[in-house]
Amino acid sequence: MTNIALLQSLGLFDARVPRYTSYPAAPVFSGAVGADFQAQAIEALDPAVPISVYVHVPFCERLCWFCACRTQGTQTLAPVEAYVGTLLQELELVKQHLPAGVKAGRLHWGGGTPTILSPELIHKLAQAIKAVIPFAEDYEFSVEIDPMMVDEPKIRALSEEGMNRASIGIQDFTDIVQNAIGREQPFENTKACVETLRRYGVHSLNTDLVYGLPHQNRESLAATIDKVLSLRPDRVAIFGYAHVPWMAKRQKLIDETVLPPDIERHELANLAARLFTEGGFERIGIDHFALPDDSMAVAARSRKLRRNFQGYTDDTCPTLLGIGASSISKFEQGYLQNTAATAAYIKSIEEGRLPGYRGHRMTEEDYLHGRAIEMIMCDFFLDLPALRARFGEPAETMVPRIAEAAEKFTPFVTVDADGSMSIAKEGRALARMIARLFDAYETPEARYSQAS
């Protein structure tokens, strides 16, 4: 039996499982955990330990059909200006609970399209954030950039405010693919954007691609990757397209009949992995690549890689503070998501209330299962002695789960003499399915994307 046939027999192309960018996954969050928890968690922060800050800008001038992110379209700047004003109000509410001296080791603007902001709004928002949570000495400020919605004045403003890493969404450069997903983005515009970023001193660059898109094939993806390599990014993520039109209504505009079949989709992922590794990148986890001297590659080699809502990260900050509609915070005590609908989020802020509306209070069992899953997703290795050292006797509950994984996913999963579990290189596409065996929560499969 070929490797791909064996993976298919194990259910790789049928399973729908979490991406495990958090544990527990967001569908487990409950309305029983809200703004009071949010306030208490902020008040408990240690000023000596830098935090990460995520700011969500949900607006886009165009809504790409493939996207399942929390976004909304606008053709004018008026709602964006009003929203930035609300972000500033939220920062003031956070400030009321924030211990003096807390600093940001990481700041990330995501969306949506953060570069829909005018230069004036960029300055206004960045300065308001830094007034409440100043940068730590060795900070990273990254921004998601749409090359079709950015110009030199915006890049200059971001650079002046301290942006030192840019994340550029690409998806695919092929015309027929772009037309099929409602996204126009010529390579020439992207190249010009990258050149401008570097001219303004932004030398750390991430690019995001997607495989499994309509009309995508080996030739078109290879051509896209060749162009991406010419841009010389430090990191690349290539995510599998999640076709969930029952959740993301705009995906109904995509013709399902021209989506690549399961096996071809898997081969596209393998092709991308081969081309990027041949291009000098190291493979990171299930869907990221980084140059050998990049901090993410260094973290992966030393088993210090972590998962967060952006995917893989080398961020060592234990706290993620989410600002903006639908943003999610991660505290030592658990997770908290802000109100998702922009209008409801604004109403909460205008009433002087923190906007947290659902979350999850972590238990010691959650920490154990979460760390086991993170090891699987990041290292393809579950270090049982390390779990025993950290969690003590409860770590023994992992033993039957390890045995189940080894039995169910033979020959890709093996158990070492000390009880640790390893996933073979040929079976790493199964990582999310294997991680599911260590998930203590049952949630409907329809909420998740295809495992491959």
Curated annotation (Swiss-Prot):
S-adenosyl-L-methionine 2 binds at residues 66, 112-113, 171, 183, 208. InterPro entries: Aldolase_TIM (IPR013785), Coprogen_oxidase_HemN (IPR004558), Coproporphyrinogen-III_oxidase (IPR034505), Elp3/MiaA/NifB-like_rSAM (IPR006638), rSAM (IPR007197). S-adenosyl-L-methionine 1 binds at residues 54, 111, 144. Pathway: Porphyrin-containing compound metabolism; protoporphyrin-IX biosynthesis; protoporphyrinogen-IX from coproporphyrinogen-III (AdoMet route): step 1/1. One of its GO terms (cellular component) is cytoplasm. Its main location: cytoplasm. [4Fe-4S] cluster binds at residues 60, 64, 67. Transmembrane segments: none annotated. One of its GO terms (biological process) is bacteriochlorophyll biosynthetic process. This is Coproporphyrinogen III oxidase, anaerobic 1. It catalyses: coproporphyrinogen III + 2 S-adenosyl-L-methionine = protoporphyrinogen IX + 2 5'-deoxyadenosine + 2 L-methionine + 2 CO2. The keyword Oxidoreductase applies. PROSITE patterns: RADICAL_SAM. The keyword Transmembrane does not apply. Binds 1 [4Fe-4S] cluster. The cluster is coordinated with 3 cysteines and an exchangeable S-adenosyl-L-methionine. It is found in: Cytoplasm. PANTHER family: COPROPORPHYRINIGEN III OXIDASE (PTHR13932), OXYGEN-INDEPENDENT COPROPORPHYRINOGEN III OXIDASE (PTHR13932:SF6). Its EC number is 1.3.98.3. Residues 45-278 form the Radical SAM core domain. Its cofactor is [4Fe-4S] cluster. Anaerobic transformation of coproporphyrinogen III into protoporphyrinogen IX. Dedicated to bacteriochlorophyll biosynthesis. Keywords: 4Fe-4S, Bacteriochlorophyll biosynthesis, Chlorophyll biosynthesis, Cytoplasm, Iron, Iron-sulfur, Metal-binding, Oxidoreductase, Porphyrin biosynthesis, S-adenosyl-L-methionine. Belongs to the anaerobic coproporphyrinogen-III oxidase family. Monomer.
